[in-house]
């Protein structure tokens, strides 16, 4: 059986699909993961994925492309699957993707759907209220005939050794960036946290992507080690795997840390619900006002002056959370 799993949004979303992908892989001969370009690096980390098919959907992402008939026709020609799971967040519809899969001749399609699917779905599944994204995907997979083959935790392929980047000895990682501004702690607070953690005797590595070098340099200052722009996705997985604790917002590195089994201090902006997006399957401490006015708004930019949901969190709060997790592990 050739199976396809679709998760068209971001890096972290694709990581959260990982347990469901493994469930499919346990029964299928070949698994294709259909994802967007932001999710592709995560897709290549997932055990059970044989092929990654990258496509930018006009109904997803921060800057969706225009609808082009030739683009959709080209995707239809590339899809070769007998069965498919369409994984979406609770606020997204699977039906546009299901239509493309039907046009490609996929015989069995399953998805969570609030909307009436007509003939687009063979299994219209109902998501459990308040289910975590990883659990919701596993539930759908099981309903479609792919039971859990293992403990259902997040996993990635074994990352490369990171000692050449991290140096020797224990360390804490602080990742100050986020996919959207509403989910980011202020750089000043992050820099204070680096200083406070260093004063407590921790070696602090500050991570970030190629476009975040100015941010990571500012946050690391004289007390942290700046790794901004120095790691690709597998290398970042290795850095996070070696950390005692990772401090980050509700963004991709939180899920990557969970996938390598590292405890997380989660600076969680409630623009999306923590019950669905918190670090999954690892010890974690959730910081941030979950009842702030921005709650459940899915805002990209904070709609409340001063960003109080996160900026009321202090460096001392973060340092205390790190010590709590270290005491538990």
Which residues make up each language-model segment?
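Catalytic machinery of carbohydrate-active enzymes
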Residues: 1-329
